[in-house]
């Protein structure tokens, strides 16, 4: 575009009006053609906030030739509601809409956070949820309500993102185990310091800290999604959105997902519509003691 793509694409024509930089599209199309001709195994990903139609269609079919685009609205949304709304104000219908707002022809990479959140100037989701408590209350023996809430939401946000947000999933530099701090590369503004130009991967293997529980949840979540080929199955199917109880039920492939976003209520014997009658087995729960409860 001749702009940054942060406009209201309220009709199809907005993707093809005079705001479109046609020279840039030709260049990107030729670049994708060259890359895939030279390296058929290569994957190219568009960092495009608009979700332009045709961006992930082959050039021979009139598209730009990217394999995927980044679902940039998803991490922006999570940070927005964490910054601006209390738990009681979360709109579960809005969550569903943002997660599933993509064109079927544009294969989307879903992710909960990336450099916009992790680099200096913002906070990772884990740090925004738990802040200074992460420095002294991440020991497994500690009991801390801020950490318990933060870990619960961190797991739910990642699970919701991978289950509904796209056709691929991206972890980013330690968010799979809730890395606490930001990334800051050496520059004049920090006196060329390397102090934050790192990720402390040892946190995820330290058996005394809760980071390993968040990491174990991530591995279990990805195993479940890969085993059931959820990301190859298009869109999830919504069965229930209970605004009063802040609960959601949806299916994807042969999995049924039930989310309770309510900050205080745990509803016993909850009744919800399901795709088909029968017995269901519990494959994954964020409440598992292995994942920090």
Language-model features and meaning:
Residues 1:
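Short acidic catalytic loops
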Residues 196-201, 206-229:
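Catalytic cores of secreted or luminal carbohydrate-active enzymes
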Residues 287-293:
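Solvent-exposed beta-strand/loop surfaces of large extracellular or lumenal domains
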């Amino acid at each position: 575009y001749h702009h940054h793509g942060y406009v209201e694409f309220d009709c199809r024509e907005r993707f093809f009006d005079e705001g479109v930089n046609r020279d840039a599209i030709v260049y990107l199309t030729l670049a994708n053609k060259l890359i895939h001709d030279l390296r058929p195994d290569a994957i190219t990903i568009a960092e495009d906030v608009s979700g332009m139609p045709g961006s992930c269609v082959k050039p021979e079919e009139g598209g730009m030739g990217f394999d995927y685009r980044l679902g940039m609205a998803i991490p922006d949304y999570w940070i927005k509601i964490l910054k601006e709304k209390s738990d009681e104000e979360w709109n579960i219908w809005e969550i569903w809409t943002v997660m599933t707002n993509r064109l079927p022809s544009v294969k989307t990479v879903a992710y909960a956070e990336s450099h916009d959140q992790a680099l200096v100037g913002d906070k990772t989701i884990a740090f925004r949820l738990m802040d200074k408590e992460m420095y002294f209350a991440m020991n497994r023996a500690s009991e801390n309500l801020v950490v318990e809430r933060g870990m619960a939401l961190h797991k739910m946000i990642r699970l919701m993102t991978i289950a509904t947000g796209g056709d691929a999933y991206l972890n980013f530099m330690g968010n799979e185990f809730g890395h606490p701090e930001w990334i800051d590369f050496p520059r004049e503004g920090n006196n060329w310091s390397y102090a934050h130009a790192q990720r402390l991967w040892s946190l995820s293997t330290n058996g005394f800290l809760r980071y390993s529980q968040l990491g174990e949840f991530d591995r279990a979540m990805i195993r479940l999604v890969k085993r059931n080929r959820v990301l190859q199955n298009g869109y999830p199917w919504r069965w229930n959105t209970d605004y009063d109880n802040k609960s959601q039920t949806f299916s994807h492939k042969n999995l049924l997902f039930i989310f309770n976003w309510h900050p205080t209520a745990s509803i016993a014997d909850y009744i919800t519509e399901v795709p088909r009658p029968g017995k269901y087995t519990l494959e994954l729960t964020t409440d598992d003691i292995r994942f920090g409860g």
